[in-house]
């Protein structure tokens, strides 16, 4: 009796699972794994190193990465092919919110791809100038027991030891505090 039950369930379950991933199976050959990007990233890295007149040793030094962050549009339009509109928007947003991207993260951006996830995470866009949202959507200030300590949950704390970051991500909920 058990063998009959086990014999049927896996076949039915297998068919069900296979059906659920059918769309993935059709597209999986087109999904980049990251290996394909190696040459592009390496090309971008060399382009950046040439632009800032640096070496591979510099590039592998995190101190150099922090010191050499891009904090405005200067150079970015050449390195990642920003349009004139993107360049002026970047400068406008950067005048209101701090902006920085390390050479490493810059090398990951796919030039010319408006939907590049790294670009969206790191390069300011016009939508940041909309003031429709709240400045503190997570009510960090209301949950802060001190300027540098936020306690939203009884069993954990967020301790903000610095207001400096290697890259000011565009989605960061604390960007209103950066530089204070």
Predicted segments, located by residue:
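Flexible, acidic/Gly-rich N-terminal and inter-domain linker regions that tether
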Residues: 1-151
């Amino acid at each position: 009796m058990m063998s009959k039950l086990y014999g049927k369930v896996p076949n039915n379950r297998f068919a069900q699972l296979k059906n659920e991933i059918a769309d993935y199976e059709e597209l999986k050959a087109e999904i980049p794994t990251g290996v394909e990007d190696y040459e592009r990233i390496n090309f971008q890295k060399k382009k950046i190193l040439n632009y800032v007149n640096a070496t591979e040793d510099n590039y592998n030094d995190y101190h150099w990465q922090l010191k050499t962050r891009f904090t405005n549009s200067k150079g970015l339009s050449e390195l990642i092919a920003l349009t004139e509109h993107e360049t002026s928007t970047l400068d406008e947003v950067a005048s209101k919110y701090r902006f920085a991207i390390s050479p490493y993260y810059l090398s990951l951006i796919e030039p010319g791809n408006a939907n590049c996830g790294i670009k969206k995470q790191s390069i300011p866009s016009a939508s940041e100038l909309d003031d429709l949202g709240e400045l503190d959507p997570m009510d960090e200030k209301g949950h802060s027991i001190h300027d540098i300590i936020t306690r939203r949950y009884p069993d954990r704390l967020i301790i903000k030891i610095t207001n400096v970051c290697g890259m000011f991500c565009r989605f960061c909920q604390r960007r209103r505090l950066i530089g204070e």
